[in-house]
Curated annotation (Swiss-Prot):
Matches recorded under Gene3D superfamilies: Bira Bifunctional Protein, Domain 2 (3.30.930.10), GAD-like domain (3.30.1360.30), Nucleic acid-binding proteins (2.40.50.140)
Pfam families assigned to the protein according to its UniProt record, in alphabetical order: GAD, tRNA-synt_2, tRNA_anti-codon
Binding-site list for L-aspartate: 178, 224, 458, 495
UniProt: ATP binding residues: 224-226, 233, 488, 540-543
Annotated organism of origin: Acaryochloris marina (strain MBIC 11017)
Record's protein name: Aspartate--tRNA(Asp/Asn) ligase
GO molecular function per UniProt: aspartate-tRNA ligase activity; aspartate-tRNA(Asn) ligase activity; ATP binding; nucleic acid binding
InterPro entries in the record: Aa-tRNA-synt_II (IPR004364), aa-tRNA-synth_II (IPR006195), aa-tRNA-synth_II/BPL/LPL (IPR045864), Asp-tRNA-ligase_1 (IPR004524), Asp-tRNA-ligase_1_N (IPR047089), Asp/Asn-tRNA-synth_IIb (IPR002312), AspRS_core (IPR047090), GAD-like_sf (IPR004115)
Family: Belongs to the class-II aminoacyl-tRNA synthetase family. Type 1 subfamily.
Cellular component GO terms held in the UniProt record: cytoplasm
Enzyme Commission number, as recorded: 6.1.1.23
Subcellular location(s) per record: Cytoplasm
Amino acid sequence: MRTHYCSELRNDHVGERVTLCGWVDRRRDHGGVIFLDVRDRTGLIQIVSDPERTPEAYPQADALRNEYVVRIHGEVSRRPDDSLNPRLPTGEVEIYADQIELLNAVHQQLPFQVSTADVESVKEELRLKYRYLDLRRDRMHQNIMMRHRLIQSIRRYLEDQQNFVDIETPVLTRSTPEGARDYLVPSRANPGEWFALPQSPQIFKQLLMVSGFDRYYQIARCFRDEDLRADRQPEFTQLDMEMSFMSQEEIIQLNEDLMRHVFKTLKDIDLPKTFPQMTYAEAMERFGTDRPDTRFDLELVNVSDLLEDSGFKVFSGAIKKGGQVKVLPIPDGNAKISNVRIKPGGDLFSEASAGGAKGLAYIRVKDDGAIDTIGAIKDNLSPEQTAELLERTGAKPGHLLLFGAGPTEIVNASLSRLRLALGAEMKLIDPDQIDLLWITEFPMFEWNADEKRLEALHHPFTAPYPEDEADLKTARAQAYDLVYNGLEIGGGSLRIYQADLQRRVFDAIGLSEEEAQDKFGFLLNAFNFGAPPHGGIAYGIDRLAMLLSGEESIRDTIAFPKTQQARCLLTQAPSSVDQKQLKELQIKSTAEPKN
């Protein structure tokens, strides 16, 4: 049907007869000569229909409109010197069409312009409703192709250079505790019983290690029924990897090699030979988050020990209750940040409130080195405390010190949000810089206040450090997350591979022996048959594709995404189903019917 893709043609093809297929991207009539930009998935080529040179094709060219589907037969010609277009790979040539076939027309008004030349902003709801048109647009087309090349580069590296095996794991499995809610699938063959769609292939990839497949990977589809944000989808894709007989440092080294391969292949970027590492405790202390953006220098300073005896009760009271007082020092903050922004109703107050803070205290360092603040703080800081505070924070004349006081998690969350907001506002972040950082030594568990129990910070199959096994409740996990400019792109750990230790971890999170056996008996039993030491990692393909494409939402790198309400605007899923189907499954809905 065609001899070439549109974007393949160059000067070397001049004089050749070619057949092309694609969509009319744009039509222009210049003094009776019709110019068509025809588009396929590789790009654009200019088609010329001249009534004097090729009169047999002119009527068809004259009838064409944007997004008509066509087949073009003609001869490749060099463009006149004054018509060269250096912005196009095909900008030195054009096709004189002597035959044009209309394969399909557009029978409705386009909801928005698709043309590569059109840069109008289109509402996302409209784009998602007509996603097949949106995907024709150059930006979206490039995003999907970047995603394809990302997965292609991963496969080639893991299989050709690292001897990994691609193995599929079940999509219909059983529901297990921990983590987000499962998507459940009723079993018609087994009434009253349910499958769950996998949140990850975690257990199956560990079983593959027990099975002797020492280097496994999969581009896996995963499902989580959770509240959505800009970077979350109910169904998502991850690169899933698991390796036997490798230490944590060996796994980290292999993954650094993988990232270097991906970035060099796709962006021609040379990443460093090794990526820096930072413990979870250090990241939380310095940046208030376990995924710090280290492209700029604003750091939090813990002054709890200095202010625990302060007469200012907001500070001393927070510390006595087991909380912290931290400072975010802002160079030149006096000139750039007004009190209005810090007080209730101000944007910085609102940013801190989003992290849970009830207010913001501040100190300004005046040009003469004296401090300016509210009386309650100034009156309750001794000269020695003030001097020590300025020294610890590195404050100089012109500095603004923003304080967070309260429960540690709230102080960290609120000040880390302020740090990012001010870093962006003050243009401290180089948008072209890439910082990759490993966060290590996570706590094994965190306290769930609602359920009044410990829960695994990552998942309950993560191995503790051997020296911490005696007291699991305070143990560090042999876990590692890879952070890209403040976004987590991958996370993994060494795994438990001994049944007794796995039972102890289940017990620590409140799973009884009976529950553990019911939910995970098959895994515990497998560990009794010679399970090797193993570990792994998983990367979010959607997020990686987003970052490599320079987008701000993963929805722009997924062909058919859901909205933040977990709906597909194209197919109108989810939808009600026929009562006959529910009857076969022995299910009855208690929800009110929708109009």
